[in-house]
Amino acid sequence: MKKFLLLLFASALFASAAELRTIKDMDGAEVKIPAKVERIAALWHSNNQILLALGGADKIVATTDNISKNAWFLKIYPRLAQIPVLLKNNDVNLEELMSRNPDVVIVSTALAGENLAKQGFTVLKASFSDYEQMRRSIRMCGDMLGGDAPQRAKDLISNLDKNIALVSGRTANLSPDKRPRVLHIVGGSDLLKIDGKGTLIDSWIELAGGTNAITATKGPMKTITAEEIIASNPQIIIVGGDHNEDAVEKIKSSPIYSGTDAVKNGRVYGNPRGVFNWDRYGADTVLQILWAAKTIQPELFADIDIKAETKAFYKKFMNYELSDAEFGYILKGLNPEGK
């Protein structure tokens, strides 16, 4: 009887081990996840769109406040309205998260991952700060999802690489004096919050033929002084967030910006915003590369049809046919009803 129980225990352990597989997250940590992942708590805003692009949105059982408020995500993926919001203002509802019983929790910071791992959750850090890291993160998510997701990940990366190659082929040899100073403001609600060096935003600015106007500040969403902005004298200003036309007018009338070359020469632009903000860390950055290139170096990219590229991308990866009007709303940072 004792031998039988030992054999039974050993077989249970073997079966348990056989049901797990190992995957590396963005910190290089080897994480054991179920052989078939069915329930994902997507607690990094932009990763929700990556999962959608890879065909894995049906596995999301918890999302974030940022995503729940995105009217484009809801339009394209109506089930979003039924998914609990368990990350609000960067705080996780642990009790509710436990009740959702996720196979994997996706996070953006090591600290968040450590805290959740201590509570017994299986955690994958998915965040990235440049395009090479983004490729790794997309592959990781494809591997995690399984099924046809790895192939969709390859397709998404291929699309990214195609646009990078197209743009870099025309901008790589630009001399410094041909690269305008570009300031990227996170959103219209705070005109002093910018994105510095060492960010994905900095990557697409450089790729598109510009240079970051703010060189002394590193990292995303950093608050700087009005004096720093005035001293940097950006030649182009790009502002993210929704209702970007309102933000552009706010910048033009701001005493901080009125003396900059960007305002004087009419080169203040609102960044497109669709299922995720194009300028940030979602799948739409594939389109951002082209839009930024046309915006920063219009003479070099007059042949690029952003509308056609956007429609094709949304059809393939968002499974949605954009109308001409909807494309126009995305460019202006408006919702699907044009508001």
PLM feature segments, named:
Residues 4-15:
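Sec-dependent N-terminal signal peptides
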Residues 26-28, 83-95, 217-226:
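Short helix-initiation/N-cap motifs at beta->coil->alpha
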Residues 41-100, 104, 109:
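A short, structured surface patch at a secondary-structure boundary
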Residues 91-101, 119, 224-233:
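Short helices/loops that flank or line small-molecule/ion binding pockets
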Residues 111-119, 240-254:
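A ligand-binding cleft/hinge motif common to bilobed small-molecule-binding domains
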Residues 113-191, 214-216, 267-334, 338:
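Extracytoplasmic substrate-binding proteins
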Residues 193-220:
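Alpha-helical, coiled-coil/dimerization segments enriched in small aliphatic residues
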Residues 203-204, 215, 221-242:
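Ligand-binding pocket segment of bilobal, Venus flytrap-like solute-binding proteins
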